[in-house]
Amino acid sequence: MSVQEVVGDPRFFARSGPYDVAAVAEAVGASIPADCTLSLTGVAPLQIAGPSEVSFLDNRRYADALEQTRAGAVIIKADMVDRVPAGVIALVVPEPYLAWARVAALFYPLPPVQPGIHPSAVVDETACIDPSAQIGPLAVIEAGVEIGPDCRIAAHAVIGAGVKMGRSCRIGSHASLSHAILGDRVYVYPGVRIGQDGFGFAPSSEGFVTVPQLGRVVLENDVEVGANSTIDRGSMHDTVIGAGSRLDNLVMIAHNVRMGRACVIVSQVGISGSTTLGDHVVLAGQAGLIGHLKIGSGARIGAQAGVMADVPAGAEIVGSPAQPAKDFFRQIATLRRLARR
């Protein structure tokens, strides 16, 4: 089977535009000569972009592709201007990838919400749904739910009793939310589970006794939760995901975890109960954290790290058990030297 590569396949993505290059430059804060009047119709990678498309370079390893591109305009840093082919307009910015995100969103904005409640949706009469919200097929909205303006609830999603969400939230298909408070612009992708019981039980002579989980989940503004991730509600304190944080697919957050602002949690990370993260913490794929830890702001934890102790702010740690990155790589280098003897 042969499928031609297409950026923004119109079967799936609605394109806006065209836009004059001056409008694109203004959107990213770039300056261009006053006589530039090129009309741009879309975005594409350097290798396949055509004369009416915008591309970008943020990684120098692709500099050769920049020199050969046929794009109409490219978003680059100042130190790459001399490698832009003749006839290609350079949009010079300090952060090309950030500018690229804004330009791509300009050409491919999010689909507008289609206000209304699908006839097959099950909506409790006590739910409060803003008239501008969209409730999809077979969605379930339970008693006392509050859904703000411009929200979209996709097919088969279940919004449990009392859940409250702000404006412009997106809840993916087959997601379930209970015992949760959502801010504005929260994106919950398909299959996510939010607000279920935390993993709490007390041992007894006859087995285990389940501990009631009496907290909530709070997702602050601009949080995104990737597909099939799970966030347990708190036992007595809330589980909190700080504003602007991004959780990848298949992430597990246990009860009472408190995450600061703008954290990045990559796929298959597991954070045990009552662990606290500061702001701008990064956890790479499959990292595991035991409970009741404190991870300082700006800490970076490597892939598959096993974190069993507090991590100071700004630290970089890797390995299992986790240790400072410099120590880890020094040990690896020593082992390699010993192995050659």
From Swiss-Prot:
Q: Name one GO biological process term.
A: lipid A biosynthetic process
The pathway it acts in is:
Bacterial outer membrane biogenesis; LPS lipid A biosynthesis
Active site feature: H255 (proton acceptor)
* EC code(s) of this entry: 2.3.1.191
EC top class, as a word: transferase
**Catalyses which reaction(s):** a UDP-3-O-[(3R)-3-hydroxyacyl]-alpha-D-glucosamine + a (3R)-hydroxyacyl-[ACP] = a UDP-2-N,3-O-bis[(3R)-3-hydroxyacyl]-alpha-D-glucosamine + holo-[ACP] + H(+)
Name this protein carries in UniProt: UDP-3-O-acylglucosamine N-acyltransferase
Species, as recorded: Granulibacter bethesdensis (strain ATCC BAA-1260 / CGDNIH1)
